[in-house]
Amino acid sequence: MNARLATAILLATCPFATALADTKVVLPDSQRFADTGRDFLLETTIPGDFKTLEGIVWGLLTLSSKRPDKRFSSPFFPDAISSTSHREGAQPLYMYFRGLRQDGSKVILRFTGDANRYLNNTAAIQELVKGALEATIRLHTTKSTTVYYEIDGQIVEEWDA
């Protein structure tokens, strides 16, 4: 009888445990970035238990502001580019995200042209944005994963900054 009761309790609480699960991501520690510019990408969590790589990237782009440790910055929102000429009319980066494709150890992040406000900004902003995206992807795949960026259907090989 006790085993049945324990099983019933476990089954009843299982959906709540899943709802409270977090996903590991990598975000920049703004103080470390300002101090040394090195070793500033650190592991933290966002709320939600994302199962696919596309879900994890979507969660990173949309929920990074909900991180538990506020010393980490969330470089995917207009505040991150407020000091640059790209800020006028900028939306959060997730508004420009069109999904991803995987082919073996290759991941292609797909965006519309307006994503260049973040992806082709100053070198520092590019480091924060792309660094967090690429490190999070490698956290959930293999370290040898290569990340490419597709803007309006074209793979971008070189960035301005």
Task: Name these PLM-found stretches.
Residues 19-161:
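Bimodal "functional hotspot" detector
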Residues 14-16:
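N-terminal signal peptide c-region/cleavage motif recognized by signal peptidases
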Residues 8-9, 19:
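Cleavable N-terminal signal peptides
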Residues 1-6:
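Bacterial N-terminal signal peptides that target proteins for export
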